[in-house]
């Protein structure tokens, strides 16, 4: 056992010694390897550092060489490249348009619809290697620059001689030419030989094709503008034409009056005396009924007569009512002229109600029996209020007031339920007639038509709308016209829509009622002292208001101004001086105007002063209105009659005070004339100023104007002539002249509209007379935009639109001249010398013919865009389906 143990122990010891020796050997080999690796890494680092130093030296040499050989800076190179890119784009675009038009011409001859337009290539202008290789494989491949000095120099020399951008553009042109030639060859192969010969002949004798294409494009734009302008002129609220001969109208009764025995027993001399006593009534016409003396002579139904006696408490008819009521109830058409506040409204309301009661009441959406048209919203509301006195107790008599500025949905709701009477303004009535293709409102049942304030309605230019409405009504209707004034030139127009009318004139035309006490306050100021004149009037107004309100604390006061701004300023002044006041004028919303009248008319509102423009001169009937003050004198006598006629109504007494300056001779002349006609006292100073004015008129230095001239009436014939001239130009004057018999029997349904002149785009070579200074143009063009529609003008002259056109065309565009309303003419026709007096126009100036032509093309496109928008709005407004 001991021997074995010793042997095993010896073996173990020897094994450990061997193991220790091998471990020492492996440790030595690892250290050597690590040392060798470190030495190799150090050598590699030294070599790498040496290579980097050499590379930096080479790069520095290359930079020095580049600086010495390349004199153009990097920014200049980029700028020149960008310019060449823009020129290439422009040339390519022109070439595409020319190619497109030529190819279209060829395909038209073949009568085969083929797509000839090329897809646009989206090209990245960043000339990176990846993008170039991926999108344009046919580009020339440039040699990659190395680190050698000689190679870099050679590459820079090549770059100077032939730029990479030029090579790129040239390669694209070559590819496009090849593709265009291929397409052209294919198209020509498909065309018959005869057509090809014709094309060759056209090329030989036709001149430059590009110029022809440009002229064709210009003529196309010109034709489009002309077409859209003509369409806009003829655009209106189209109503369905009605052939009355084909309609099966029911017969209706017109005559409801039987003359009383005591009236029929009177002799003609006695009748004339009665008319003289009734404010000197004058009648024109055949078989005119005699005037009534009391309400019982009319034999009205109880529901009407009870309202007159019990509610309105009218003891006897007024002068106009005495003659107009029996005439209208006899079925005659009437023209009634009487002073304001004389009861004209009741003169046609009573016959209309009697007329309606004799017929079957309207069912749902059958249309009204009576139609009353008024020029203003306020007058329409006043008429509705008068009718409601009779209809509140009778549920079968329904009335609807239709006017602009308020929601049309509520009006459509009322019409769908069925109404017997419509009171409205012409514009809104046409809207309702045209709405939903005529299914909202029709006038086939209408047999009684009233035009209140007819002269003002025609004078405001409502004649086309009124004629259009009357074409929708049966020809055997009964038509009545009433007004306080009736100029002689209106008589002919009124008789065109009436049949054998009876003219009734009470108290003379344009005469102030004798119940009104008139006073004129004269201020001795010159035309230059406007501020002083205004301050004097304000102080005088304060004195009058203070004294009058002390004597009449419950009386209402109406103050008229000429301008809307003056009305607002005067209200602010009165409120600051503790005078409760409110204003009404055309610049306010309909809700504000309605609220102002309601507050002013109310006895409990505490507001007794209303400041208004002439918008309140018609139809405003406020009880206890005792004083009218003309802060600004009216510019004609008819307006004065209507203004002061707001007081002294229904037999009550009234006062009217007018402020006027000695520097306003025309206004003084009108006031003196009105005072003479009403037999009032006249200040000698006023007569002196008026006589001087008459002397100047006789010498031709001044001119007398009357009525609302210049707002439509005087231009009606001129508008018709312009429209006829436009039709002759459009149709080459080849239409035969209309026969006189046809014009007498058939009334026109078209609405005369102002003639919209087509702008001219003539380019003139030379300097413009309007331009002064060293910078002058070589080409210019005047584009008259005065006669274009307002929204089209605004879209063209907007700063953004003009700036865009100026930037794209590199021209100068300025707005010159001044705006002239339709029908008016410039003071001088010489635009060359009087550019500031000419009609509103755009002056386009440029250094080249091409730039001016490009600017004109852009302006034409802007015109077309604006006309399209305007036509779309016109289409949506009148004929859209209203959703209730």
Swiss-Prot record:
Gene3D superfamilies xrefs: P-loop containing nucleotide triphosphate hydrolases (3.40.50.300)
Stretches assigned to the Helicase C-terminal domain: 540-690
InterPro entries xref list: DEAD/DEAH_box_helicase_dom (IPR011545), Helicase_ATP-bd (IPR014001), Helicase_C-like (IPR001650), P-loop_NTPase (IPR027417), PRP5/DDX46/KHDC4_KH (IPR056149), RNA-helicase_DEAD-box_CS (IPR000629), RNA_helicase_DEAD_Q_motif (IPR014014)
Biased composition annotated in UniProt, kind: Basic and acidic residues: 28-45, 58-67, 75-90, 173-188, 739-750
PROSITE patterns: DEAD_ATP_HELICASE, HELICASE_ATP_BIND_1, HELICASE_CTER, Q_MOTIF
Listed EC numbers: 3.6.4.13
Keywords: ATP-binding, Helicase, Hydrolase, mRNA processing, mRNA splicing, Nucleotide-binding, Nucleus
Any one biological process term the GO annotation gives: mRNA splicing, via spliceosome
Domain Helicase ATP-binding, first and last residues per copy: 325-504
Motif (Q motif): 293-322
Polar residues biased stretches: 1-25
Cell location: Nucleus
Comment on protein domains: The Q motif is unique to and characteristic of the DEAD box family of RNA helicases and controls ATP binding and hydrolysis.
Function of the protein: ATP-dependent RNA helicase involved spliceosome assembly and in nuclear splicing. Catalyzes an ATP-dependent conformational change of U2 snRNP. Bridges U1 and U2 snRNPs and enables stable U2 snRNP association with intron RNA.
Protein's name according to its UniProt entry: Pre-mRNA-processing ATP-dependent RNA helicase PRP5
Species classification: Eukaryota, Fungi, Dikarya, Ascomycota, Saccharomycotina
């Amino acid at each position: 056992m001991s021997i074995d143990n010793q042997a095993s122990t010896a073996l173990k010891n020897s094994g450990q010694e061997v193991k220790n020796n091998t471990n020492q050997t492996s440790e030595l080999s690892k250290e050597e390897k690590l040392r060798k690796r470190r030495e190799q890494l150090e050598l590699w680092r030294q070599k790498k550092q040496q290579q980097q130093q050499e590379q930096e030296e080479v790069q520095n040499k290359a930079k020095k060489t580049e600086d010495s050989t390349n004199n153009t800076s990097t920014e200049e190179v980029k700028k020149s490249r960008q310019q060449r890119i823009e020129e290439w784009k422009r040339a390519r675009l022109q070439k595409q348009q020319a190619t497109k038009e030529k190819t279209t011409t060829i395909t038209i001859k073949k009568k085969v619809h083929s797509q000839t337009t090329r897809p646009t290539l989206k090209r990245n202008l960043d000339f990176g290697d990846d993008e170039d290789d991926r999108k344009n494989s046919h580009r020339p491949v440039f040699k990659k620059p190395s680190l050698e000095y000689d190679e870099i120099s050679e590459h820079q020399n090549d770059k100077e001689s032939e730029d990479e951008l030029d090579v790129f553009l040239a390669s694209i042109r070559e590819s496009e030419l090849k593709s265009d030639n291929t397409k052209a060859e294919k198209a020509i192969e498909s065309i018959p030989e005869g057509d090809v010969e014709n094309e060759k002949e056209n090329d030989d004798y036709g001149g430059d094709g590009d110029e022809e294409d440009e002229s064709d494009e210009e003529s196309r734009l010109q034709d489009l503008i002309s077409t859209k302008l003509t369409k806009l002129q003829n655009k209106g609220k189209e109503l369905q034409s009605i052939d009355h001969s084909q309609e099966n109208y029911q017969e209706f009764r017109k005559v409801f009056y039987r003359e009383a025995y005591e009236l029929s027993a009177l002799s003609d001399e006695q009748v004339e005396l009665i008319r003289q006593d009734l404010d000197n009534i004058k009648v024109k016409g055949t078989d005119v009924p005699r005037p009534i003396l009391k309400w019982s002579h009319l034999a009205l139904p109880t529901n009407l007569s009870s309202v007159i006696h019990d509610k309105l408490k009218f003891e006897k008819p007024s002068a106009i009512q005495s003659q107009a009521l029996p005439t209208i109830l006899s079925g005659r058409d009437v023209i009634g002229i009487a002073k304001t506040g004389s009861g004209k409204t009741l003169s046609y309301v009573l016959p209309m109600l009697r007329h309606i009661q004799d017929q079957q009441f309207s069912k749902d959406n059958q249309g009204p029996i009576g139609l009353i048209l008024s020029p203003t919203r306020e007058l329409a509301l006043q008429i509705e209020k008068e009718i409601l006195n009779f209809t509140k107790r009778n549920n079968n008599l329904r009335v609807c007031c239709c006017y602009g500025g308020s929601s049309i949905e509520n009006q459509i709701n009322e019409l769908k339920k069925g109404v017997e009477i419509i009171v409205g303004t012409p514009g809104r009535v046409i809207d309702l007639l045209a709405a939903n293709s005529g299914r909202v409102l029709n006038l086939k049942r209408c047999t009684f038509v009233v035009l209140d304030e007819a002269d003002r309605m025609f004078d405001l230019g409502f004649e086309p709308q009124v004629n259009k409405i009357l074409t929708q009504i049966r020809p055997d209707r009964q038509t009545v016209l009433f007004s306080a004034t009736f100029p002689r030139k209106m008589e002919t127009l009124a008789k065109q829509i009436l049949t054998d009318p009876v003219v009734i004139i009470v108290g003379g035309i344009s005469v102030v009622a004798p119940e009104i006490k008139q006073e004129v306050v004269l201020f001795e100021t010159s035309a230059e002292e406007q501020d002083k004149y205004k301050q004097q009037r304000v102080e005088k107004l304060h004195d009058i208001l203070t004294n009058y309100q002390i004597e009449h604390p419950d009386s209402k006061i109406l103050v008229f101004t000429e301008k809307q701004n003056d009305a607002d300023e005067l209200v602010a002044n009165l409120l600051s001086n503790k005078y409760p006041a409110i204003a009404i004028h055309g610049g306010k919303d309909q809700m504000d105007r309605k609220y102002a009248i309601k507050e002013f008319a109310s006895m409990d509102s505490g507001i007794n002063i209303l400041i208004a423009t002439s918008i309140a001169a018609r139809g405003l009937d406020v009880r206890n209105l005792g004083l009218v003050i003309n802060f600004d004198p009216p510019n004609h006598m008819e307006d004065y009659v209507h203004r002061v006629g707001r007081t002294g109504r229904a037999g009550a007494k009234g006062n009217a005070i007018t402020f006027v300056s000695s520097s306003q001779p025309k206004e003084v002349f009108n006031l003196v004339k009105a005072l003479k006609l009403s037999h009032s006292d006249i200040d000698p100073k006023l007569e002196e100023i008026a006589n001087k004015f008459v002397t100047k008129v006789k010498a031709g230095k001044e001119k007398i104007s009357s009525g609302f001239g210049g707002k439509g009436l005087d231009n009606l014939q001129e508008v018709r002539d312009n429209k006829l001239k436009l039709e002759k130009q459009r149709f080459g004057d080849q239409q035969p002249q209309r026969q006189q018999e046809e014009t007498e029997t058939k009334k026109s349904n078209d609405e005369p509209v102002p003639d919209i002149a087509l702008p001219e785009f003539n380019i003139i070579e030379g300097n413009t007379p309007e331009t002064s200074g060293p910078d002058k143009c070589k080409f210019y063009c005047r584009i008259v935009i005065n006669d274009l529609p307002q929204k089209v003008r605004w879209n063209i002259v907007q700063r953004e639109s003009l700036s865009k056109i100026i930037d794209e065309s590199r021209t100068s565009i300025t707005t010159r001249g001044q705006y002239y309303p339709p029908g008016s003419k410039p003071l001088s026709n010489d635009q060359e010398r009087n550019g500031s007096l000419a009609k509103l126009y755009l002056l386009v100036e440029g250094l080249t013919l091409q730039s001016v032509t490009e600017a004109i093309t852009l302006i034409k496109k802007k015109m077309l865009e604006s006309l399209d928008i305007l036509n779309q709005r016109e289409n949506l407004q009148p004929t859209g389906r209203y959703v209730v």
